[in-house]
A protein has these predicted regions:
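Primarily secretory-pathway and cell-envelope proteins
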Residues: 1-91, 136-168
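Extracellular structured ligand-interaction cores
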Residues: 115, 124, 143
Length: 168
């Protein structure tokens, strides 16, 4: 496992994105306060960032606490792990650093505010997203596992982001 992030969401979604790759659809610059989420949902820029491997959204979440785990060329241990859904494959092209953030950062852009570096090395990856319950005794932890497999080129994405990725 590359990294585990505990998060408390405020904005009904998570975004995994490449920086500086995310700047490309905006001519190389995003102004502080700009609402790029609206651009992605009302123009073809949303499809562009998915197809070019710039971003991967996890949408339709309830506010609250989640664990997000990043696996690189390895798979999660299935002991005490119940898979709720699997979406594959997305592609991510990490040209700089890969960041995790609450979707709110795309609502009101500010460089590096609320971003967490996922510590995934540069490269092209096909990514499987799994929504899972981690069972710890009587407790259920709501988790998203991103399983990265290194590849030589971007593939054709044959999955759409879910509008409802809730695990409750």
């Amino acid at each position: 496992m590359v990294k585990t992030i505990d998060t408390d969401l405020d904005f009904n979604g998570i975004i995994i994105f490449d920086y500086p790759g995310i700047l490309a659809p905006f001519g190389g610059k995003i102004d502080d306060g700009e609402n790029i989420l609206e651009e992605f949902t009302t123009t073809d820029k949303g499809e562009l960032v998915l197809n070019e491997g710039i971003a991967l959204p996890i949408m339709g979440l309830d506010d609250g606490g989640y664990v997000v785990r990043f696996f690189l060329n390895e798979f999660p241990d299935n002991e005490d792990r119940e898979v709720i859904f699997t979406d594959k494959y997305f592609y991510l092209n990490v040209t700089g650093d890969l960041y995790f953030a609450d979707m709110a950062v795309f609502w009101e852009w500010e460089d590096y505010t609320g971003w967490v570096n996922a510590d995934v090395p540069k490269g092209i990856y096909k990514v499987s997203l799994e929504g899972v319950h981690l069972l710890k005794g009587e407790e259920t932890i709501y988790c998203y596992d991103l399983i990265f497999e290194k590849t030589n080129q971007l593939g054709t994405r044959d999955v759409e982001p879910r509008s409802d990725s809730r695990l409750y």
